[in-house]
């Protein structure tokens, strides 16, 4: 009988050990499977690299959670769960509970990839601080970071990089407390479901009239449908237009811009006709440019070697006048990781050698996503250096008259958050900004947002827009618009109309007298004088411009010919217009013209006749001195006999605007041989 009891005991003992062995083998197998996926999220404790990848955490989380439920005293699993939740964006607050458990069993001999490890690494403190930081619990985060520093000292951890990072995180939390306590007066709105998706949507760029939006998306349906190793769809560029009810449903911009690789928006010209895009180029990362011809985008062209190097260039933006490129690069010779650089457009139309923007802008950390406002002096960019409140923050800096940049200023909370805030563009009037960010009420991983400033003054700029037609009312083709400063004679911008719609758009800064010249082959130029005074307001001006053909009888008003008061002496402000006239005459050597002077109704008919003749003759004399044969031009004065507008209003009062239109010089084609 005793023998039977003994055999039964031995049988149960062996069975129990076999079950334990099987359970142990199953745990080891499941752990190794989870660990392989987990490493997509967490690289190693030494470099504390977290990758915010949907593919990584979402795949690893359920496997590790299942193991943890079987062994809730396993602090290695608690640590890994904390990492997964920390990288999940929407469940970060859940990370705190698991890190709180993990720090109760810290080991200096952590072997996280071993299924036998039941303790957690020292860096659990740092990640716990990150979780508090990202959840706006700044005092708790500071306390945990300080505990982390103390534990490193106690354990004689001499890793200076980790110590510096912890101290820097404390400074970020202190900055965050200050910024959150004094929020910017701003209304932040999600651009909505027609723009944003459940996937990552970011890097918005807009035309100056805020009617056309381009952005980058990793949504399902991307060209080629490929995914990266983290499970994200490849980047494509999408567009949306403003309607009476909001933004239209975003659609892919299509070929030849979107391919089966990665394409992202980085910059847009004010008129919305030129896009700067980022292409992955097998990890090299380069900037390309593409322009709109009617409603068809051209094949993207890679910018030259002064911009694109063998290193990484992830973002760029061109100034509104097209003269300066601001871009990001991690090339050697900078101040840290990624730095901001500038390049000037050469007279030959190429980008010149890049110049680092210097230590006022660049730090030992990363700067990215530059945006230069249409005013030409206000720079916005993202940085995880300077006084960031966490991750990348948006900063602004002003260009002074001596060419130096002011100390960057954090644009504040709630635009900036403890997380990454990047890709920020501002409307010409300065009252709205568009940016991408992760927010708790968003649709996806990152969404595009609009910020409306509630206590900010308008930026004093003038937006010029309109259409250019030919003599028949049809869209004029190949129109070039040249904007010149009449005082300095310097060309400040050259623009082109859309070949399908005839539309144009450009920005004028205040305090200048402009010659705006519209030109197309086979047509007389049309010039406009625009005096933009020093002002405090933002203006939008719409123009319908018509070009007259080069044929007998066609005429134009020379709106940028100026004389001293009551005299026939050409003022220096006329030089740009005289140069345009000279080019017109040289380009059409068989053309003869009449240059006519006109006055308003003030003064005697005899006096006005003499003044108008003298002024017409002054223009002819200038062209003759520049080499145009005198027999091709006839100077004629009409005095006040041919008014272009009424000198008086219907009620008999004076009409200053009409008088100004009447005081003019015209050119008329009289003969073409």
Task: Kindly label every feature range from the protein language model.
Residues 24, 28-32, 113-123, 127-130, ...:
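Short, conserved micro-motifs composed of acidic
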Residues 54, 88-89, 135:
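Structural motif corresponding to the intra-repeat A-B loop/turn of tetratricopeptide repeats
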Residues 383, 387-390, 596-673:
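Periplasmic OmpA-like peptidoglycan-binding domain that tethers envelope proteins to the cell wall
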Residues 517-533:
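A short, solvent-exposed loop/turn motif at the edges and junctions
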Residues 563-597, 624-625, 630, 667-673:
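Periplasmic peptidoglycan-binding/anchoring modules of Gram-negative envelope and division proteins
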């Amino acid at each position: 009988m005793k023998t039977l009891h003994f055999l039964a005991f031995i049988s149960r003992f062996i069975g129990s050990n076999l079950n334990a062995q099987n359970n142990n083998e199953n745990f080891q197998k499941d752990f190794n499977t989870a660990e392989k996926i987990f490493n997509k999220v967490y690289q190693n404790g030494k470099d504390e690299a977290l990758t915010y990848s949907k593919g990584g955490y979402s795949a690893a989380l359920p496997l590790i959670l299942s193991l943890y439920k079987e062994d809730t005293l396993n602090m290695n699993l608690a640590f890994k769960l904390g990492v997964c939740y920390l990288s999940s964006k929407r469940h970060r607050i859940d990370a705190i509970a698991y890190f709180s458990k993990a720090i109760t069993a810290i080991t200096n001999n952590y072997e996280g990839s071993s299924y036998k490890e039941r303790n957690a690494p020292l860096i659990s403190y740092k990640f716990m601080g990150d979780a508090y930081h990202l959840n706006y619990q700044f005092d708790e985060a500071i306390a945990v970071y300080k505990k982390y520093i103390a534990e490193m000292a106690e354990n004689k951890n001499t890793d200076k990089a980790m110590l510096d990072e912890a101290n820097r995180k404390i400074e970020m939390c202190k900055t965050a407390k200050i910024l959150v306590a004094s929020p910017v007066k701003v209304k932040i709105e999600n651009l909505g479901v027609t723009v944003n998706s459940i996937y990552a949507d970011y890097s918005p760029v807009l035309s100056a009239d805020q009617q056309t939006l381009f952005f980058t998306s990793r949504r399902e349906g991307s060209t080629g449908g490929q995914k990266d190793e983290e499970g994200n769809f490849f980047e494509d560029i999408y567009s949306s237009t403003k309607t009476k009810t909001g933004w239209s449903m975003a659609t892919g911009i299509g070929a030849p811009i979107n391919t089966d690789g990665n394409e992202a928006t980085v910059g847009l010209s004010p008129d919305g006709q030129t896009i700067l895009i980022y292409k992955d180029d097998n990890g090299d990362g380069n900037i390309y440019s593409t322009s709109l011809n009617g409603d068809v985008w051209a094949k993207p062209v890679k910018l030259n070697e002064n911009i694109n190097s063998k290193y990484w260039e992830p973002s760029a933006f061109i100034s509104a006048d097209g003269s300066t490129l601001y871009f990001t690069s991690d090339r050697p010779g900078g101040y840290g990781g990624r730095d901001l650089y500038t390049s000037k457009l050469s007279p030959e139309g190429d980008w010149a050698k890049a110049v680092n923007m210097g230590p006022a802008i660049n730090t030992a950390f990363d700067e990215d996503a530059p945006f230069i406002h249409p005013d030409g002096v206000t720079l916005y960019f993202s940085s995880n250096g300077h006084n960031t409140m966490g991750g990348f923050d948006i900063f602004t800096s002003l260009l002074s008259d001596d060419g130096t940049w002011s100390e960057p200023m954090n644009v504040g909370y709630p635009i900036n958050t403890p997380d990454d805030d990047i890709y920020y563009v501002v409307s010409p009037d300065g009252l709205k900004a568009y940016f991408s960010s992760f927010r708790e009420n968003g649709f996806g991983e990152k969404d595009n947002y609009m910020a409306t400033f509630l206590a900010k003054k308008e930026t004093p700029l003038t937006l010029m827009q309109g259409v250019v037609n030919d003599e028949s009312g049809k869209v004029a083709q190949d129109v070039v618009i040249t904007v010149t400063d009449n005082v300095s004679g310097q060309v400040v911008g050259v623009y082109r109309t859309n070949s399908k719609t005839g539309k144009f758009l450009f920005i004028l800064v205040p305090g200048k007298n402009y010659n705006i010249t519209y030109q197309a082959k086979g047509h007389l130029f049309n010039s406009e004088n625009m005096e933009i005074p020093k002002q405090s307001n933002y203006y939008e001006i719409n123009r319908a411009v018509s070009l007259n053909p080069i044929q007998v009888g066609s005429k134009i008003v020379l709106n940028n010919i100026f004389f001293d008061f009551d005299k026939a002496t050409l003022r220096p402000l006329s030089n740009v217009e005289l140069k345009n006239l000279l080019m017109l005459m040289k380009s059409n050597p068989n053309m003869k013209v009449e240059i006519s002077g006109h006055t308003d109704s003030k003064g005697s008919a005899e006096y006005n006749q003499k003044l108008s003749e003298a002024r017409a003759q002054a223009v002819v004399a200038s062209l003759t001195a520049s080499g145009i044969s005198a027999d091709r031009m006839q100077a004629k004065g009409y005095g006040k006999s041919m008014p272009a507008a009424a000198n008086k209003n219907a009620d008999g009062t004076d009409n200053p605007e009409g008088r100004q239109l009447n005081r003019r010089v015209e050119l008329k084609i009289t003969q073409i041989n």
